[in-house]
């Protein structure tokens, strides 16, 4: 990877994949954190630790594949592992298209019209087809704007929208559920960025890995914590909205609402380019034509997106989180000295 992309480009690539429609709209935050009350912020920090550790392990795995040809060849085609990866990227890509559909139909155009989601999918296909470098270039522009806008909406909501004391709860009875929820959310997001992070690991300096993992995770934690607070201190109806942060933005001001709707579309696009790229890479292991792999992936994504945004997030994401735990343990196991067969007390990659 070129020096000018550096750590900043890598962090923006990872965050662009993770901060999709589900996170920036608040829907994921309600499902995994905010519905349990104010104490969920503590568990968002647990998510930060797990996410940072997972990112580092994924990048290290990418370095193994790049430095050890025999290691890469050994795990090149694993049907079960590859199928799980493909399923995960299909779900995430479909969620982004369904999120775009929900956003445009409910808050912007007020009617059901598939053309907009098809256009977003088409643009994502064009960018994804040009590889990781093009995705990084796009993310370096869009992701800082997404982060600043999400932080701004969260902060503005403290001053310009009706508040409620109902959600300001420190209910400790949900601690067990929150622990599981935070773990699932961390692994869920690691799965979104799984393929691109592994590929990234093979292209960056080893000394950059920890810095990229920590900074990406800190930014993610700050965004999650701010969204949790914004959702909990505002009107009770916010938690029950299909796109809570959009709903909150419109409560502040109609202009703010429409502006943030555009930001959510950027979120959808950055995540979709990463997940669609990853999905086509999975399909490409079985279908040798890269172009046909991309077309096949895009068609599958569009069909699955017809099930709707809310249904996909509520029922598929926890399952993906559970799958993610198994896959991360598999990756961790592969990167032990026994697996790389170096026959030394310390791994040759260190």
Question: Where is each model-derived feature located?
Answer:
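Hydrophobic, membrane-embedded alpha-helices of multi-pass small-molecule transporters
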Residues: 5-24, 40-44, 85-89, 93, ...
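Small-residue-rich segments of transmembrane alpha-helices in multi-pass membrane proteins
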Residues: 13-19, 40-44, 73-86, 142-158, ...
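Extracellular loop-to-transmembrane helix junctions
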Residues: 4, 8, 30-56, 210-225, ...
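Juxtamembrane transmembrane-helix boundary signature
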Residues: 43-72, 229-230, 234
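Membrane-interface loop-to-helix entry segments
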Residues: 100-104, 113-119, 127-158, 313-331
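Hydrophobic alpha-helical segments and their helix-loop junctions in multi-pass secondary transporters
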Residues: 21, 90-93, 97, 145-171, ...
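Transmembrane-helix boundary/entry motifs in multi-pass membrane transporters
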Residues: 2-5, 34-39, 61-90, 106-113, ...
